[in-house]
UniProtKB/Swiss-Prot annotation:
Signal peptide: none annotated. Mg(2+) 2 binds at residues 121, 274. Pathway: Purine metabolism; IMP biosynthesis via de novo pathway; 5-amino-1-(5-phospho-D-ribosyl)imidazole from N(2)-formyl-N(1)-(5-phospho-D-ribosyl)glycinamide: step 1/2. This is Phosphoribosylformylglycinamidine synthase subunit PurL. SUPFAM superfamilies: PurM C-terminal domain-like (SSF56042), PurM N-terminal domain-like (SSF55326). GO terms for molecular function: ATP binding; magnesium ion binding; phosphoribosylformylglycinamidine synthase activity. Its EC number is 6.3.5.3. Substrate binds at residues 98-101, 120, 244, 318-320, 541. Monomer. Part of the FGAM synthase complex composed of 1 PurL, 1 PurQ and 2 PurS subunits. It comes from Listeria monocytogenes serotype 4b (strain CLIP80459). Gene3D superfamilies: PurM-like C-terminal domain, PurM-like, N-terminal domain. Part of the phosphoribosylformylglycinamidine synthase complex involved in the purines biosynthetic pathway. Catalyzes the ATP-dependent conversion of formylglycinamide ribonucleotide (FGAR) and glutamine to yield formylglycinamidine ribonucleotide (FGAM) and glutamate. The FGAM synthase complex is composed of three subunits. PurQ produces an ammonia molecule by converting glutamine to glutamate. PurL transfers the ammonia molecule to FGAR to form FGAM in an ATP-dependent manner. It is found in: Cytoplasm.
Length: 739
């Protein structure tokens, strides 16, 4: 092999390690761990394993704040995905993962491989993926490039999900200028597992073979993890080699073969892990480190699809659709025969050792030999300086924004045409959300619901985060994101169980950004404790900045809940004329961070809406009880656009109307006060519902009507709007903007 790689001396003197992502002090630490200077391959291994993307070195102190335990938790953070118990020996595995940087550079493949990666995380646990969700952020749809990004990201998600046959059942999309050059693509996968089948990513048992399964290794995605741990610049467009290419048909075979091994050969399978960020080095070193073992890998045996690949390239490649298995010795042929049935190659590339070293051999030579824990566990942890940004105090002291409401119906129409509020049908119609035929509530309601075959249960799932509130106040905004996710689950008839969090932030080297991360984590933790929804998995994506401009703090909350009986499934749309409409919760003049403020001022500022977690929990529990007792015909949480938008959305599906008198002034129609629900009840259930809610701030507003007119009164004031007209604006906005 021609030795083109820099020598240890050149690496040190020319500071080549800096280009690979290590700081001076980190390089010194590596030298002291090894007792010598690392060679080129070893320097590469440390640079990628100690990147933020793999080691969480900047975010670990913050992640430790999260509550991660609960009686419902079968598997908490630290494995491919978290798992919660839903009874009857079944569990639900789920996780959210970001693919932000790749999706800006190469939006179709960036989004597609994000979907592929999160699916592998879930089936590596032994769970069958049953649903996908996503949470997307883009800039305003006013440039050809913004429209191109949206179209390609959506096509990438659809292309992969539809081909592999997993329904994409829900998600959320927000448009704000801060995402123009930093789009966010967070994908969530939910899987079903028998509790007895739960797998671990571990390699133990001295002499046990380590097997490589799936696609061959190429040069795609080398340093993808490091690429995700730096700020962007316009030149970043050049980094296309760091974006991988996905093959959903290969992944489908891999999924079925791996689940086959887990189901029928659990006695000989020791551990299984997906090759994700940082590829082979990450999966193999983590599996050995978790088991307190060492590993010896022979790079000559790694299946390669390109010529003359170096050990460095093979270890760091992020080629897709690859898994690593550790099996009991003497059973290699059985495993190979099983994978062959699926047309897949399973190759032994190494074995477990007892010396806790990570040894790489190529052409008979040892090309890397480092302590396995040094790679997987011993990355330095940084307690970054944190500083409250000047804007926070300014927002706290600012005069509250008062909207201009001369023409209430005109404002209503404008709000429904905003892309963050408008119907996302144009987008989700590209996803096959009915494949597998278990989807009980399709996209477009508060939460998606998927039936659990062979039972009367269903799983409710949602993704939520209003990053504008976090920009105003990350602690309150973080709590609101969790509360809103739980509201969506409850409105659908589910009991919230746990969350996965996709923490998307700017550059943590900036003290103001690190402050946002800390405060958001405090808010999320407080809400998770109050609502009993521990954090069981997640992902951190930092450095979402381009040319010094960062995103709003965007911790995406993915939540799963249990619908105990299919009869409890509830949707947001009004069902019958004559049904009685109630509002749960208090409406105040809260417009800061609202869709209305953005529309009228072109910016957001002021104090975030208030959230009282005790009240939130009480209302959620009461509403869920009412739903489980069969008293509720429809329920909808009040979110962006407040009461006006929620009321309009409730009328759209059946083309009904509403005649209501509200307990607040009409200029508060679009206030975004928290902890509110719009509920409709059959007349014969009205008394029982009112009795259940009697001590709370629950208001009887009026009735659902047959005609397609919404009438809203407060004392002497009244506004009237046509459902059909509002609906055509709401449905037409995004197709029109994407033209």
């Amino acid at each position: 092999m021609p030795n083109m790689e820099p020598t240890t001396k050149e690496i040190k003197e020319q500071k080549i390690y800096q280009e690979m992502g290590l700081t001076d002090s980190e390089y010194e630490l590596v030298c002291s761990i090894l007792g010598r200077e690392p060679n080129y391959t070893e320097t590469g291994l440390f640079s990628v394993m100690w990147s933020e993307h793999c080691s969480y070195k900047n975010s670990k102190p913050v992640l430790r704040k999260f509550p991660t335990e609960g009686k419902q938790v079968l598997q908490g953070p630290g494995e491919g995905a978290g798992i919660v118990d839903i009874g009857d020996g079944l569990g639900v595995a789920f996780k959210v993962e970001s693919h932000n940087h790749p999706s800006y550079v190469e939006p179709y493949q960036g989004a597609a491989t994000g979907v592929g990666g999160i699916i592998r995380d879930v089936f590596s646990m032994g769970a069958r993926p049953i649903a996908m969700l996503n949470s997307l952020r883009f800039g305003e749809l006013d440039t050809p490039h913004a429209k191109y990004l949206v179209s390609e990201v959506v096509a990438g998600i659809a292309g992969y999900g539809n081909s592999i046959g997993i329904p994409t059942v829900g998600g959320e999309i927000q448009f704000d200028p801060c995402y123009t050059k930093n789009p966010l693509v967070n994908a969530m996968c939910v899987g079903l597992i028998e509790a007895k089948d739960i797998q671990k990513g571990q390699a133990k048992g001295i002499g046990n073979p380590v097997m490589y399964v799936g696609a061959k290794t190429g040069r795609d995605g080398i340093h993808g993890a490091t690429f995700a741990s730096v700020e962007f610049s316009e030149e970043g467009e050049q980094q296309r080699s760091a974006v991988q290419v996905g093959d959903p048909f290969m992944e489908k075979l891999l999924l079925e073969a791996c689940l086959d091994v887990i189901r029928d050969h659990s006695d000989i399978l020791v551990g299984i892990q997906d090759m994700g960020a940082a590829g082979l080095v990450s999966s193999s070193s983590e599996m050995a480190s978790k088991a307190g073992a060492g590993l010896e890998l022979i790079m000559d045996d790694v299946p390669q699809r390109e010529l003359n690949m170096t050990p460095y390239e093979m270890l760091l490649s992020e080629s897709q659709e690859r898994m690593l298995l550790c099996v009991k010795k003497g059973h290699v042929e059985e495993i190979q025969a099983l994978f062959e049935r699926y047309g897949l190659e399973a190759v032994v590339i190494g074995q477990v050792t007892d010396d806790k070293m990570y040894k790489i051999i190529h052409h008979g030579e040892v090309v890397a030999n480092v302590p396995v824990d040094a790679l997987a566990e011993d990355a330095p942890v940084y307690h970054k300086p944190s500083k409250e940004p000047a804007r926070y105090q300014a927002f706290q002291e600012e005069e509250s924004f008062v909207p201009v409401m001369e023409d209430v119906v005109g404002v209503w129409k404008e709000l429904l045409a905003q892309p963050t509020i408008a119907s996302k049908r144009h987008i989700y119609e590209q996803y096959d959300y009915q494949v597998r035929t278990d989807t009980a509530v399709v996209p477009g309601s508060d939460a998606a619901i998927v039936r659990v075959r062979g039972t009367e249960k269903a799983i409710a799932m949602t993704t939520d985060c209003n990053s504008r509130y976090l920009y105003l106040d990350p602690e309150v905004g973080g709590a609101i994101a969790v509360a809103e996710a739980a509201r969506n689950i409850v409105c659908s008839g589910g009991k919230p169980l746990a969350i996965t969090d996709g923490l998307n932030f700017g550059n943590p080297e900036k003290p103001e950004i690190f402050w946002e991360i800390e405060k958001a984590a405090d808010g999320i933790s407080a809400a998770c404790l109050e609502l009993d929804t521990p954090v069981i998995s997640g992902n951190v994506s930092l450095y979402n900045e381009t040319d010094g401009t960062g995103i709003y703090p965007t911790p995406v909350i993915g939540m799963v809940g249990l619908v105990e009986d299919l009869a409890h499934i509830t949707t947001q749309d009004f069902k019958n004329s004559g049904d009685v409409i109630f509002l749960i919760g208090e409406t105040k003049a809260e417009y800061s961070g609202s869709e209305l403020q953005k529309l009228q001022q072109g910016k957001i500022s002021g104090r975030a809406p208030e959230l009282d977690l005790t009240t939130e929990k009480k209302y959620q529990q009461l509403l869920l009880t009412a739903i489980q007792e069969g008293l509720v015909a429809s329920s909808h949480d009040l979110a962006e656009g407040g009461f006006g938008v929620a009321l309009a959305e409730a009328t759209f599906k059946a083309g009904l109307g509403a005649d209501v008198e509200v307990p607040f002034e009409l200029n508060q129609l679009f206030s975004e006060s928290q902890s509110r629900f719009l509920v409709s009840v059959k007349p014969e259930n009205e008394a029982a519902f009112a009795q259940l809610m009697e001590l709370e701030k629950v208001y009887r507003l009026g009735v659902v009507t047959e005609d397609d007119t919404i009438r809203v009164k407060h004392k002497e004031d009244q506004v009237t709007a046509k459902t059909t007209e509002l609906r055509s604006i709401w449905e037409g906005a995004i197709p029109c903007l994407l033209k």
